[in-house]
């Protein structure tokens, strides 16, 4: 069951990708969707065994590689964290597959699309079931390359090409950090296996590594590189620029990327390595600050966006910030709780937005929408449920998961927790503001489309509606039904999946907070609803235009529109200098300049010139040509032998020095 659960998406991807043209589009797509549905059902069964029966399954399949002391085995680890993740991944992915059957119906390359979707899911499953860092990194890289292929699915679009490259390049910074973190893990622990590392971690909390002459705590240094990987993959502040550009892919890709797969990989990495990272207060503080600032940043940017998908994308970035700073405050169970509920209502929002875009002939600008509440009533109801869940409306999913993060953050009574809680409350207001702004501009007021567009507006088809209804039901009930399972005081399901200090019982503290603090999210919700209603409902004049006549409001507006100038600074300080260095210096001045002159082109030109001058001054015979050819061949042979001997001597020298180095301890 466990192996089948992992390989079913791979089987669906191979059949659809390699044999789709022979089997036909319809049959191959049905196979891919069927494999994903079976995977989701098997994940639910595994969740029953692991979560409700309170068991852990860990087994080794084979030895992957063995080089010296490095022994990497291919194994699968199904614990509470893994079972929650595979349920979320496969359920959301199966809904996206079903939705895409009609959404991509007219696309000529739909078999390739479904193959990519299934392979994307397989790599994410491989990542979360890994029992060692190397296997996790393999899944990590697979998710990255598949995101490139999916964002760039419509490869004839220039903007899609640029967005996919941007996503890959920025994620390479994160991959670089994780790669070096894994190298340091092996250097310190002599193993990459989670069970070994987490068992030894408490005994090396004082171990240091000499870095450029400074003694640095080993766990802090390892954690720093892991955090770089988390920041890149989960689009946290600094490496977030790829996230809104990823909207260039098809809308189902956005739902899969930003709900259950790629962006949650960073949060999963923090949760998986929590038995290691929790021993470094520095790393926990960094996670808290980065997560809180990302929440604030994404909220302010989302307020001024006009693209319906980009608004939802920035809300994803903001919610990921909640999860990250919850991890930094050791609220791991609250973080995975919010990750789970967020996956369902965020997938609902993206797929509802896809239904709107599909009905409006691919229009994404909210300023060109309006009046759709009567034309697309079911889509409106689903979008409303997703919006209410996102904003924390009482008794919906987001209400339980987001409020527990805010309450436990304030209950830490440290400055980091207070800082994160204050930003979280402010972001809760901003989230409500831009969510209802989206709802009002899209579904209310007078239609702002062309008449021919209005005439063609239609509700989504059955295959697109079924996932919306299922996700809407989950967005309403899953937070309430799973609250005790995730954050209940008596829940035993987490066992050793997470690490927390024994005195870190923040759930109890959050239950006795002041009433005013518990009501703050509700006040933020009320004001967040009233403000966009005041500015955008039944517009007779653009009230925002009058607002930004105020100099401070105007500067703030442009600061947010320019995305805090991150794109500008990254282009001016990083991209342009590197392009100048690579093209003007390395390419023109060196590759096509200096190296050509002292290399093949320069030598050939000099020889031709010399020989031409020699011919003009001397009589050349056939024997002279033969003599020169023989001399050239002998010269080439001599140079080759000489180079080989020099290289051989260097190798011998290194061998001798290495032998002496190994013998030195014995001599002493």
From Swiss-Prot:
Q: Give the GO molecular function terms.
A: NADH dehydrogenase (ubiquinone) activity
Query: Which reactions does this protein catalyse?
Result: a ubiquinone + NADH + 5 H(+)(in) = a ubiquinol + NAD(+) + 4 H(+)(out)
- The kind of enzyme this is, by top-level EC class, is translocase
GO terms under cellular component: mitochondrial inner membrane
Write down the superkingdom of origin: Eukaryota
Instruction: Enumerate the Gene Ontology biological process terms.
Output: ATP synthesis coupled electron transport; electron transport coupled proton transport
Transmembrane intervals: 1-21, 31-51, 81-101, 111-131, 133-153, 178-198, 211-231, 251-271, 283-303, 311-331, 339-359, 375-395, 421-441, 462-482, 519-539, 566-586, 629-649, 650-668
EC number(s) for this protein?
7.1.1.2
Q: How does it sit in the membrane?
A: Multi-pass membrane protein
The entry's keywords: Electron transport, Membrane, Mitochondrion, Mitochondrion inner membrane, NAD, Respiratory chain, Translocase, Transmembrane, Transmembrane helix, Transport, Ubiquinone
Compartments in which it is found = Mitochondrion inner membrane
Task performed by this protein: Core subunit of the mitochondrial membrane respiratory chain NADH dehydrogenase (Complex I) that is believed to belong to the minimal assembly required for catalysis. Complex I functions in the transfer of electrons from NADH to the respiratory chain. The immediate electron acceptor for the enzyme is believed to be ubiquinone.
| Family statement | Belongs to the complex I subunit 5 family.
Record's protein name: NADH-ubiquinone oxidoreductase chain 5
* Gene this protein is translated from: nad5
